[in-house]
Amino acid sequence: MFSDSDSSDEELSRIITDIDESPQDIQQSLHLRAGVSPEARVPPGGLTQEEWTIDYFSTYHTPLLNPGIPHELTQRCTDYTASILRRASAKMIQWDYVFYLLPRVWIMFPFIAREGLSHLTHLLTLTTSVLSATSLVFGWDLTVIELCNEMNIQGVYLPEVIEWLAQFSFLFTHVTLIVVSDGMMDLLLMFPMDIEEQPLAINIALHALQTSYTIMTPILFASPLLRIISCVLYACGHCPSARMLYAYTIMNRYTGESIAEMHTGFRCFRDQMIAYDMEFTNFLRDLTEEETPVLEITEPEPSPTE
């Protein structure tokens, strides 16, 4: 999986440990690691930088507001990214499926179980939630680092797999307990929203709320009303745009905090995402800005007074 070249390992180690680089240095480092000179910067697939940028922005950013747009870029790199994810995630995916599904199954049991079984279902829900959170903390961080190293050495551009990582956003579900403890508004303020984008902010809020209700099932499911609220939030929060933004939020929020103290690769991963986002956001702004004629409004001269 890892390159045998000492120079490549040395360069990769320097980039990962040097977390104080400017955005320009980060972008240059990313292109160098991908085997592309800063002058050429021609992405894989035969596309020019401009064509690839437009394609990337239309397939990653636009579906956040309109999930119905086809992901052509994702389809082109499906085989390679899927093979990477299979290899990098094989060590913990099999158990995480169990830890993810069991709490959801036990959520429905209070509706059909007799009162004498309610304490048992709550205990099992709490147990599976704790196991799931433990699996994520000690499994997903290593998977991301392994995935990043694989992409960097193989010369794969990071934005090509962001969509695939978003599809695996269920891995981040139980980490929301920390987000909720820090406050719901902190989550929403990470994404400045325009007036037209308020439904997206509502989806993010619903997703975080339903996750908090899911994790704290033994505490909150004391009445049928709370059970119904939880199921409604759980259903509303799983729209594609909420899942994608939610995964992006968690990755940006926690790659630079406690987990980064254990694995500096997380912060490198966060810096890569920020660098690409800055690069393509600036490009789109320059592309869409049009010079509009400035209308000079001259006030009429006052009439001479006699």
UniProtKB/Swiss-Prot annotation:
Keyword ATP-binding: no
Localization of this protein: Host cytoplasm; Host cell membrane
Membrane topology: Multi-pass membrane protein
GO cellular component, one term: host cell cytoplasm
Keyword Nucleotide-binding recorded: no
Entry keyword set: Host cell membrane, Host cytoplasm, Host membrane, Membrane, Transmembrane, Transmembrane helix
Transmembrane segments: 92-112, 120-140, 161-181
Principal location class: host cell
Subunit and interaction comment: Interacts with host RACK1.
Name of this protein: ORF-B protein
Gene source species: Walleye dermal sarcoma virus (WDSV)
Lineage: Viruses, Riboviria, Pararnavirae, Artverviricota, Revtraviricetes
